[in-house]
Amino acid sequence: MTTRDGVWVVAACFNEEAVIVRFIERVLAVPGVDHLVLIDDGSGDATLDQIRIFLSQRRSLGVPVPLTLLELTRNFGKEAAMLAGLDYVRERCAAAVLIDSDLQHPPELIEAMVAEWRAGAEVVTAVRDDRDQESRLKVLSASWFYRVFNKVVDSIQLQEGAGDFRLLDAPVVEAFTQLRESSRFSKGLLPWTGYRSVELPYQRVSRVGGSTSWSPLKLIGYAFDGIFSFSVLPLKVWTGLGVLVSGLSLLYALVIALRTALVGPDLPGYASLMVAVLFLGGIQLIGIGVLGDYIGRIYVESKARPHYFIRSIDQG
């Protein structure tokens, strides 16, 4: 078994050619950082080349570089890339720091995170205290997501503004990497492990290069992944709605029966009949969709496919 030693920084990279060299230099300049692990998640630009050129230049100068590059065979997604990095450092590090490679997470904050860890923290979570650079719609939608998630999920509570920028003690890394589910939601999985967390506020800066790969649809899908991964309340909601609609239907049938007995039958109401049929049909289709989402997740989990494949490992 490899000896666990030092603080290892883990960062997934996807199309970050404009900033990746600056990111490497800033991370390695932080006091307390012992090693940097970059995971190229199938980048389509020159990200991989930029990292290899950096390594080659340092080697030609005879300068040792505490940097390891994991090249995945394709784009498996950020969650899988982070897991690949943590799998690699699991038996090598005393603590691991998860950080984005686009420089919106300030690498200099790692020094304060390490200080909290050395003081006894098991998890150090960087929490955004400023969202002025984002649109009003994005701020409101994010706030709505956290409120809904914390209401429908009993086992954990998410801290608004907390993302993937965290320091994890070695036992936390070990526990987290044991969770091998396919639909991963790290923001929820890390609190679910139950380790105590210390929070550090920070201000997220604008991107200095490149563009985000997270579209609004991807963000919405990620939000639903989080809720469906940690709660069966959507199933219970549709069960309750079915009971409610059935109860109202029986009540309405009773009203019609009494009215017919007292004043005679009404003329056929085609409009009201169509409204009722379409309403019930819509309810049924939505309910089937919710049920299908859960069944689909069971199907994906049952195949137990690996989360990623590594093409090459390049150590500096």
Where are these predicted regions, by residue range?
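Structured catalytic core of nucleotide-sugar glycosyltransferases
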Residues: 1-135
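Hydrophobic helical membrane-anchoring modules
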Residues: 1-3, 185-316
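A generic fold-level signal
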Residues: 2-4, 64, 91, 160, ...
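Short conserved micro-motifs on helix faces and helix-strand junctions that flank
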Residues: 5, 12, 72-74, 166, ...
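Residue-level signature of catalytic and energy-coupling elements of molecular machines
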Residues: 27, 85, 102, 124, ...
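Acceptor/aglycone-binding surface of glycosyltransferases and processive sugar-polymer synthases
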Residues: 66-74, 78-88, 107-186, 205-224
